[in-house]
Amino acid sequence: AVSLVQVAGFAGAPAVSNPQGNVAAPTAEAIADYIRTQHLKAPVIIGHSLGGEVALMLGARHPDQVARLMIVDALPFYTLLMDPAATRETAAPQAAAFRDALLASPPAQTEAMQRASIARLAKSEAARPALLAAALGSDRKTTADATYELMTTDLRPELGRIQVPVEVVYAYDPLYGIPAANVEATFRNAYATTPHIRFKRIDDSFHFVMLDQPQAFATAVTDFLQP
């Protein structure tokens, strides 16, 4: 059986008011509650991007409730992509500015920003219209809060608590403008304290690996799910 998680506030799903402004952390707790209440026996968790952060939180904070984790193109601290020496403290001002800009921008500017962002995240032009529609159908405050949370949450100190196997699938494309070895080093360094980990690179893909290289991604998932 497969459980598909739809996060409130994204892609047309009604938003949930959260005074703390967190999205990933309460989602992880809600999934942990779901696993308990549905009496699921340590499911396999696959998460992409924000979902990858949620999967890491589940593995670190509820290690007995999951069997394995697949993290798809996500780091335990998002801001490392922009600054390898970043800390939560140094990331906060930039994250706040980005959040405030998202909240303040008029609709036309928001659409232009999302369109430009998606062009960097999906190499497949055919995949972009649906991604844009999902982005524009998302609650703006939820998106802004999630972005701030991702940019200021450093899960590296928690990685040592993950007791189950972890596979990190990450994208690479020459259009990134940096050598593949640099991207690999970024991921390996970020996950250095994760006990049982392996990495898989999928080439000729941007961030939305499952859309840019669907066959390669499907194979990676199938291999991962083998007992």
Region spans (language model):
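Active-site loop/oxyanion-hole signature of alpha/beta-hydrolase fold enzymes
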Residues: 4-46, 60
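Active-site loop/turn elements of alpha/beta-hydrolase fold enzymes
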Residues: 7-10, 74, 171-173, 204
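Active-site loop signature of alpha/beta-hydrolase-fold enzymes
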Residues: 10-13, 77, 208
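Conserved hydrolase catalytic core segment
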Residues: 41-83
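Flexible "cap/lid" loop of the alpha/beta hydrolase fold
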Residues: 67-105
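Alpha/beta-hydrolase
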Residues: 105-178
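Conserved loop-alpha-helix segment in the C-terminal half of the alpha/beta-hydrolase fold
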Residues: 165-206
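Catalytic histidine-centered segment of alpha/beta-hydrolase-like enzymes
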Residues: 202-214, 218
